Amino acid sequence: MMQDLRLILIIVGAIAIIAFLVHGFWTSRKERSSMFRDRPLKRMKSKRDDDSYDEDVEDDEGVGEVRVHRVNHAPANAQEHEAARPSPQHQYQPPYASAQPRQPVQQPPEAQVPPQHAPRPAQPVQQPAYQPQPEQPLQQPVSPQVAPAPQPVHSAPQPAQQAFQPAEPVAAPQPEPVAEPAPVMDKPKRKEAVIIMNVAAHHGSELNGELLLNSIQQAGFIFGDMNIYHRHLSPDGSGPALFSLANMVKPGTFDPEMKDFTTPGVTIFMQVPSYGDELQNFKLMLQSAQHIADEVGGVVLDDQRRMMTPQKLREYQDIIREVKDANA
């Protein structure tokens, strides 16, 4: 389709150019033909002037004055017909030829008069050379007609580009649908746990066995199963065990005779769930650890053997609540 349109535009442009050229040639020939038609009239006028010029020469004796008078008329007639492109050779040669046989004895200035007429008509000869110049404006409209021809050719691909532009958004939705994250499964609640505390001597020292034994007994611990001490529901050792106390050094057992016994520390632990209220049992366990540490001159540590902090105590309580909820 685009090629057909381009061929049509080229043909139309060529026809327009040929039409302008033909019109230019026709107008130039028309002007030239009109100029040739006017020439016989001009020649008749020039002959009449020559005849009158000859008659005046025969009647008048003052040749010099007549020549001056006629010289003034001849250039006037030449200036009137300059625009009509007169040929100087044909118009002024007859008077020159007629003047030579009739007045051969006259003064030589006669030869100077015709040369003055010869260069003057040369001026109109140059004027028709400039007349073909109007053909130039005829060629100017040809250029704007040829220029618009490529414009539709360039404008035509634009819709093609626009047609491809909507294709881009079609390929744009490349991002794959993001899979929804799987719901995070709740962490299974603990159904049992062990709460651990340590009572240790200061760095570089050990706990004395005799002082340790007295403090353990004052806290309500009784020597029992697995050769360790237990804290029962009743101070006399009756009822279920709430929490227990073992040696920090392996195998973790004690000898009832602790006079010569030393150790870097002891470990108190409670298993959850346990008998009764686990939170109340935890408070009792913490009080027992603080009492022993005060008696032997030690410190209370957590399960990582670091200084016990309020944050760690709250963490122990949260674990106990979690276990209670799991077993509720």
UniProtKB/Swiss-Prot annotation:
Residues 1-6 are periplasmic. It comes from the Bacteria. It is a single-pass type I membrane protein. Residues 28-328 are cytoplasmic. The chain crosses the membrane at residues 7-27. It is found in: Cell inner membrane. Residues 51-63 have a biased composition (Acidic residues). Residues 99-115, 123-171 have a biased composition (Low complexity). Essential cell division protein that stabilizes the FtsZ protofilaments by cross-linking them and that serves as a cytoplasmic membrane anchor for the Z ring. Also required for the recruitment to the septal ring of downstream cell division proteins. Interacts with FtsZ via their C-terminal domains. NCBIfam families: septum_zipA (TIGR02205). HAMAP family: ZipA. This is Cell division protein ZipA. It comes from Escherichia coli O139:H28 (strain E24377A / ETEC).
